Amino acid sequence: MVKKHKFYTKEDLLCSSRGELFGKYGPQLPAPNMLMIDRLVKVTENGGNYNKGFIKAELDINPNMWFFSCHFIGDPVMPGCLGLDAMWQLVGFYLGWLGGKGKGRALGVREVKFSGQILPTSKIVVYYIHFRRIINRKLFMGMADGEVFCDGKIIYTANDLKVGLFQDITSFKKDFK
């Protein structure tokens, strides 16, 4: 049984990346450098825009982060796909927090909009994930909308983020059809 906390530290998230937080068969977060979250400051089963679950998480930005040196040389900016991946990471984390088992896989997103950027001079990124639906059948799946704020300004939105937990990833395509 997963012990549900209302917040999680960086060390807790690193435990998740090692497969220690949700147990041997629970989903994992990626390890650094792909872990795009420093802490979860709020996790609830209710709340959010649809009253079906909510996460607020944060990432501290510093100019030495790995992607600034290569994306782009002379014009450093955090790749937008990393912010999108962070939202998928959070949906998968939530499925583990609910007690789901399996390996998490992003299954898509209906719409993503970018209206700002994360620069080396930025200080903090805040993610808001509003759960629309949790499906627990053959496939355990979460559907959510997300917002990304940088230094208090909304810069990305994503509608219908989807993440599923798979017992056997060799059947990934078959299970999703």
From Swiss-Prot:
Keywords: Cytoplasm, Fatty acid biosynthesis, Fatty acid metabolism, Isomerase, Lipid biosynthesis, Lipid metabolism, Lyase
Active site, per annotation: H71
Any single GO CC term annotated in Swiss-Prot or TrEMBL for this entry: cytoplasm
Tagged with keyword Lipid metabolism: yes
InterPro entries: FabA, FabA_FabZ, HotDog_dom_sf
Pfam families noted in UniProt: FabA
Biochemical pathway: Lipid metabolism; fatty acid biosynthesis
Main localization category: cytoplasm
Keyword Cell membrane: no
EC nos: 4.2.1.59, 5.3.3.14
Subcellular locations according to the entry: Cytoplasm
Catalytic activity from the UniProt record: a (3R)-hydroxyacyl-[ACP] = a (2E)-enoyl-[ACP] + H2O; (3R)-hydroxydecanoyl-[ACP] = (2E)-decenoyl-[ACP] + H2O; (2E)-decenoyl-[ACP] = (3Z)-decenoyl-[ACP]
Xref: SUPFAM superfamilies: Thioesterase/thiol ester dehydrase-isomerase (SSF54637)
BP GO terms, sorted: unsaturated fatty acid biosynthetic process
GO molecular function: (3R)-hydroxyacyl-[acyl-carrier-protein] dehydratase activity; trans-2-decenoyl-acyl-carrier-protein isomerase activity
Job of this protein: Necessary for the introduction of cis unsaturation into fatty acids. Catalyzes the dehydration of (3R)-3-hydroxydecanoyl-ACP to E-(2)-decenoyl-ACP and then its isomerization to Z-(3)-decenoyl-ACP. Can catalyze the dehydratase reaction for beta-hydroxyacyl-ACPs with saturated chain lengths up to 16:0, being most active on intermediate chain length.
Subunit structure: Homodimer.
HAMAP family: FabA
Family to which the UniProt record says this protein belongs: Belongs to the thioester dehydratase family. FabA subfamily.
Name under which the protein is recorded: 3-hydroxydecanoyl-[acyl-carrier-protein] dehydratase
